[in-house]
Curated annotation (Swiss-Prot):
Keywords attached to this entry: Cytoplasm, Endonuclease, Hydrolase, Manganese, Metal-binding, Nuclease
Pfam families: RNase_HII
Matching InterPro entries: RNase_HII, RNase_HII/HIII, RNase_HII/HIII_dom, RNaseH-like_sf, RNaseH_sf
Co-factor note (free text): Manganese or magnesium. Binds 1 divalent metal ion per monomer in the absence of substrate. May bind a second metal ion after substrate binding.
Annotated positions binding a divalent metal cation: 17-18, 113
Highest taxon in the source lineage: Bacteria
Upper classification of the organism: Bacteria, Bacillati, Cyanobacteriota, Cyanophyceae, Synechococcales
Function recorded in the entry: Endonuclease that specifically degrades the RNA of RNA-DNA hybrids.
Recorded name of the encoding gene: rnhB
Entry-linked NCBIfam families: PRK00015.1-3, PRK13925.1
GO aspect biological process, one term: DNA replication, removal of RNA primer
Organism the protein comes from: Synechococcus sp. (strain CC9605)
Protein name stated in the entry: Ribonuclease HII
Keyword Cytoplasm: yes
Cofactor dependence: Mn(2+); Mg(2+)
Length: 199
């Protein structure tokens, strides 16, 4: 984790991040996390960083620690149907907004991972490029969102066997693409994402 000193923490600051933006299947998830400095230090010592850099075992171990140490956390999601209807950027913003609105108190500042502002949020915000590697609050949000989405996709894999969802979590792996060609999409696939693949 780098440049922590330049990014605020505290009871009035929420970090927000999304997961599943590039998937072919299922919803896009977001999480919002409020962390005080002492909790951030504990989490960083426990190995907190960008969820993409963590093993599944490490991420799973961090979830209860984040939940016990944070001031507040919340999840939001936008469905594949919403993604098809309004596009991935708007759907991602909706998921982030839903997470922020589920916090017990509206944050005075939102740290948004990436370089695109959250257009639906009307309070103060700051975009943070590579935020999940620079802000403990954003990193914690990335872990919670990733674990929650992966758990949902594992449950859905039982409803839709044959697509390997439990292995690739809905991302466009070669196996997933071949399953789509062989069997066609499910109702929970993002049909607008499949036009090039399936014609």
């Amino acid at each position: 984790m780098t440049a922590q000193e330049s990014l605020p923490l505290g009871r009035d600051v929420a970090g927000v991040d999304e997961v599943g933006r590039g998937c072919l299947f299922g919803p896009v998830f977001a999480a919002a996390v409020v962390l005080e400095g002492s909790a951030a230090e504990c989490l960083l010592k426990a190995g907190l960083t960008d969820s993409k850099k963590l093993s599944a075992k490490r991420r799973a171990a961090l979830v209860p620690l984040i939940q016990s140490l944070c001031v507040a956390s919340a999840l939001g999601q936008a469905s594949a149907r919403e993604i098809d209807a309004c596009g991935i950027r708007v759907a991602t913003e909706r998921a982030m907004l839903r997470a922020l609105q589920r916090l017990p108190q509206s944050p005075g500042l939102v740290l948004v991972d990436g370089n695109l502002p959250l257009r639906l949020w009307h309070g103060p915000q700051r975009t943070v490029i590579a935020g999940d590697s620079r802000s403990a609050a954003i990193a914690a949000a990335s872990v919670l969102a990733k674990e929650a989405r992966d758990a949902l996709i594992r449950r859905l894999s039982a409803r839709f066997p044959g697509y390997g969802l439990e292995r690739h979590a809905g991302y466009g792996t070669a196996q997933h693409r071949q399953s789509l060609i062989d069997s066609g999409p499910t109702p929970l696939h993002r049909h607008t994402f499949l036009k090039r693949l399936l014609g």
